[in-house]
């Protein structure tokens, strides 16, 4: 790895401060000509007149170095004179880097200049606070990347970030298992952004996700973390215009986020070139290795170079993941932070109801609970639309989303709900994977899920990043066996709902 890429311009051996970095700016001869023109208009700088070229070619390299050094010295001298400083003072060899969005990234007090969001004072569980005490600076990240991390509101790494960031930076394959809502997205986005060479116009990182909404969310996180870097992020998913994606890929793209089918389609057409892609990240890896996606994922890997690095992240790892790991990740670094499956901050209740009483029960929950935002899960598209209509008739604001909606409509609903335009969202399991909306503190399973895996991902939509949350399950007579089985599989306790629920367990 080029050591200059470890520092931002103007710091250490960074491109901005290294006089030996010959590829910077116009060719040397042009610089020399420009320098001579400036000498005629600025006679008081004659002490920096460059020596005439010597005839002995073994001095060429030394002379190039000297000319570059003089250019740097003279540039600093002019800058100081413009600022009204003493002309006779000794110029420094290191140039200051340009300010990024009004922030001088080379300044020693760069942290004080950041526009930090308000501090989140809510209670957090040990799912995200039980760390080793590391700081983001300990990983020697680019200064501009650190600026984006802090401006995103991150204070210090969560446990999954502490484990995965340094290992990913070494180039090792990773198989990481951590709970929903503990910071997995940043755990792979940060090393991906750090390893991208901004000067190289090629796709260097591909992030695969199973749903379109998760692709949009992940690309947004990458853009926010890398906003001070010159890294081009692109998102591509099925259901959107293929023509627009093709046009976009003719422009520079460093990091590509998308669903496997669409990226494979663009790759087969020869539009998406992956020969320089050194890192493949699989978020929600267990879903990506389901029969629906696995053939596309395996075909896509064939287009990557043999030296590629694969990072796999998920909360659950079934047998299919082990088979894939044995084939494509011979010696991965394994991270397992799953001492238990459900988040510590989520309190789970069930209520026995008859099918015809469910809407009435939901109305009672709305009136008694202190809801910031809630997600209500149904098992079918038809039931989603019917329930959303019922909730609206009861006088509560409500959106709904499911897989049969047009992609533009889905995007709009997702965006509006995330921005707080509505308090309640009714949806199918489309919305269970990776969707991170911090304001959601209540999840209601209007229809109880059939599998423990689905249940785990549903309730994980509340209590994000160590905050408190509440999951309420409406259980019919037919669901009682499922309830018992899921409790056993997850090793968790789902309690009967009490007459009054203490707000402190989900609103602190």
Swiss-Prot record:
Which Pfam family, any one of them, does this sequence belong to? DEAD
Top EC category: hydrolase
Give the residues the record marks as binding ATP.
Answer: 178-185
Instruction: Give the matching PROSITE patterns.
Output: DEAD_ATP_HELICASE, HELICASE_ATP_BIND_1, HELICASE_CTER, Q_MOTIF
Catalysed reaction, written as an equation: ATP + H2O = ADP + phosphate + H(+)
What stretch of residues is annotated with the motif DEAD box? 283-286
Helicase ATP-binding domain: residues covered: 165-335
Q: Which intervals of the chain are annotated as region Disordered?
A: 1-123
> For this UniProt entry, what's an example GO CC term?
P-body
Q: Where is the signal peptide?
A: none
Family the entry assigns: Belongs to the DEAD box helicase family. DDX6/DHH1 subfamily.
Protein name stated in the entry: DEAD-box ATP-dependent RNA helicase 8
Task: Give the species this sequence originates from.
Answer: Oryza sativa subsp. japonica
| Upper classification of the organism | Eukaryota, Viridiplantae, Streptophyta, Embryophyta, Tracheophyta
């Amino acid at each position: 790895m080029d050591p200059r890429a470890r520092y931002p311009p103007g710091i250490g051996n960074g491109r901005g401060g290294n006089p030996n970095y010959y590829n910077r700016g116009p060719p040397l001869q042009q610089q020399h000509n420009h320098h001579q023109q400036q000498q005629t208009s600025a006679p008081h700088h004659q002490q920096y007149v460059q020596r005439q070229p010597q005839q002995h070619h073994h001095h060429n390299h030394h002379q190039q170095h000297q000319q570059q050094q003089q250019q740097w010295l003279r540039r600093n001298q002019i800058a100081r004179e413009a600022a009204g400083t003493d002309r006779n003072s000794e110029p420094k060899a290191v140039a200051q880097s340009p300010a990024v969005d009004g922030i001088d990234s080379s300044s020693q007090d760069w942290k004080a200049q950041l526009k930090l969001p308000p501090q989140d004072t809510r209670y957090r569980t040990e799912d995200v606070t039980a760390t080793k005490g590391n700081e983001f600076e300990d990983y020697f990240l680019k200064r501009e990347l650190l600026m984006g991390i802090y401006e995103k509101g991150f204070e210090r790494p969560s446990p999954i970030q502490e484990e995965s960031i340094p290992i990913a930076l070494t180039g090792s394959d990773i198989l990481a298992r951590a709970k929903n809502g503990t910071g997995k997205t940043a755990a792979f986005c940060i090393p991906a952004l750090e390893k991208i060479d901004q000067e190289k116009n090629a796709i260097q990182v591909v992030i695969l996700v199973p749903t379109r909404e998760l692709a949009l969310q992940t690309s947004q996180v990458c853009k926010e973390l890398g906003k001070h870097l010159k890294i081009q992020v692109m998102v591509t998913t099925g259901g959107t215009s293929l023509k627009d994606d093709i046009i976009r890929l003719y422009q520079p793209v460093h990091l590509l986020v998308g669903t496997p089918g669409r990226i494979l389609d663009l790759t087969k057409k020869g539009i998406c070139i992956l020969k320089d892609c050194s890192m493949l990240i699989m978020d929600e890896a267990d879903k990506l290795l389901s029969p629906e996606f696995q053939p596309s994922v395996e075909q896509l890997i064939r287009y990557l170079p043999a030296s590629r690095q694969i990072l796999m992240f998920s909360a659950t790892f079934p047998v299919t993941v082990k088979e894939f790991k044995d084939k494509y990740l011979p010696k991965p670094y394994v991270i397992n932070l799953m001492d238990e499956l459900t988040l510590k901050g989520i309190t789970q209740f069930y209520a026995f109801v008859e099918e015809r009483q469910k809407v009435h029960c939901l109305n009672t929950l709305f009136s008694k609970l202190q809801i910031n935002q809630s997600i209500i899960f149904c098992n079918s598209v038809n039931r989603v639309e019917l329930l959303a209509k019922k909730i609206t008739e009861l006088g509560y604001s409500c959106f709904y989303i499911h897989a049969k909606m047009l992609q533009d409509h889905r995007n709009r609903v997702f965006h509006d709900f995330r921005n707080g335009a509505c308090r309640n969202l009714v949806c199918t399991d489309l919305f269970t994977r990776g969707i991170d909306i911090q304001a959601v503190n209540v999840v209601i399973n209007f229809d109880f899920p059939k599998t423990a895996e689905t249940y785990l991902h549903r309730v994980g939509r509340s209590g994000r990043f160590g905050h408190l949350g509440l999951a309420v399950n409406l259980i019919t007579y037919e669901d009682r066996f499922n309830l018992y089985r899921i409790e056993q599989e997850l090793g968790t306790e789902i309690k009967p709902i009490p007459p009054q629920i203490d707000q402190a367990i989900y609103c602190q």
